Amino acid sequence: MRVAVIGMGLIGGSVLRALAAAGHRVIGFDADPATRGTARTAAAEAPPSARWQIAPSVSAAVADAELCVIAVPLPALEIVLDEITGRGYRGLITDVTSVKMPVLDLVERYLEGGSQRLAGFVGGHPMAGRETSGFTAADPRLFDGCAWVLGLEPGRTMLGDWLDLAALVTELGARAVPATAAEHDRAVATISHVPHLVASAVAEQAADPLAAALGAGSFRDGTRVAATRPDLVAAMCGGNADAVRPVLDAVIESLTAARAALDARDPIAALRPWLVPGHRTRSTWPATAGEPLPMRPSIPALLDLGRAGGWITSVSTDRTTVTAVRPE
């Protein structure tokens, strides 16, 4: 497949490298000239069978592409879409943005009034972020075993487009997870965005030199994502504010209950029941995978699979069957 990757940070650069390693014809572009230079040098040093090209512009990158992967921050997405549609690109488009409703709302504007400036769009989000960033952090194995959400909107998403992307991401080692944009945003608020905020709040307390000197496993594991660039976290959480607010409120309410337990006559006894639900949930995560089974794909069946915590591991060449896994 001929693929254009627009934006070559950690995720975009990893997509670029992974697709090239899988034998696809890939061309990348980044607005930063230094990033383009670094990526061009890395391409020359890659094995001949896993090399990619670097384009001088968005238009040049998508000129011959069948698929365009947009891997830019949410605030830059509209600029890229304008350039792509202005070029007359008619291939499939996906993105890797960590929030999906704002992206879906933006894409809808390109489809209003029957203009069909976009031929096909399937939102995406590989759950493979790290605290490192930039093309130098890109890794072609980044997606091995990761959940890659692919947006599936009844009445909007073409099933064939979704299956084509599911086939591609599973080829890269990911698990394709079907979900609507709203379902995705609620879920990532819980398991990604609010944990970033909590980690930053805890990490701030280690400004004390003695506390920093004593930091070990609990501090390291509980604050790892606080090392993520603040502008990236702000874009993630602020872009998903509607979903983040109720989850953050629930966490604050829970911590307030823990604070009250510390004032009890017996704080140890008071804290114990507060700790049990979190311990139980974390001890059973991740869920044990069930047996992979063939499934006839349809939008309702795929969404039911995603809501049950399941995923797709492969797609047949003729797109008539997928291999589905549900948690036990």
PLM-predicted stretches and their roles:
Residues M1-A55, A60:
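NAD(P)+-binding Rossmann beta1-loop-alpha1 motif at the extreme N-terminus of oxidoreductases
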Residues H24, Y89, A174:
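Short phosphate-binding/catalytic loops that engage adenosine nucleotides
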Residues A55-S98:
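Rossmann-like NAD(P)-binding element
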Residues V80-T136:
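Rossmann-like NAD(P)(H) cofactor-binding subdomain of soluble oxidoreductases
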Residues L142-A227:
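Internal alpha-helical scaffold of NAD(P)-dependent oxidoreductase catalytic cores
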Residues L214-P286:
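Interdomain hinge/lid region at the active-site interface
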Residues L255, L262-D263, P267-E328:
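NAD(P)-dependent dehydrogenase/reductase Rossmann-like domain
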